[in-house]
Amino acid sequence: MNLVQAVYLNNAVAPFDNQQVRQALCYAIDRQSIMDMIADGHGTALGSSIYPAFTKYFLPELVQKYPYDPAKAKELLAQAGYPNGFDMTISVPSNYQPHMDTAEVVAEQLRAVGVNVTIQPMDGACGMSRSIRAGTSRPRWWAWMPVP
């Protein structure tokens, strides 16, 4: 299945309004490890949530922009004023187990750099829509795929 999974942050609220925090989160995630653990090694690491088939919008130079580097992630968090990390909750659609499994791996990787992640299962698209309409600033997990 061609599927892009991503965590979407509200860049207007702390701590996600800080570019160094967002960069730290990128460096903290080992995308290849996720594919190895969740998809039996299948998949392609992307540098954005734009599917490569959308060639007009996909930027291949982003693929290697943030290589897995937990030391760099910790350094950026400290520079951003979070030397001990911070707490965050990620809302994840619970209607598809691979989303939940992937979110658990991401949470573990973020915890390794000091970001204490709690996963909040949501009842699929309806729960996510309610959360978005309510203006909740919580990070959200989302996945999408191209439709022929």
What kind of region is each of these model predictions?
Residues 2, 31, 50-51, 124, ...:
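Beta->alpha turn/N-cap motifs
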Residues 24, 28, 37, 76-80, ...:
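Generic, well-ordered alpha-helical scaffold segments in large soluble proteins
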Residues 90, 102, 108-148:
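Periplasmic binding protein-like
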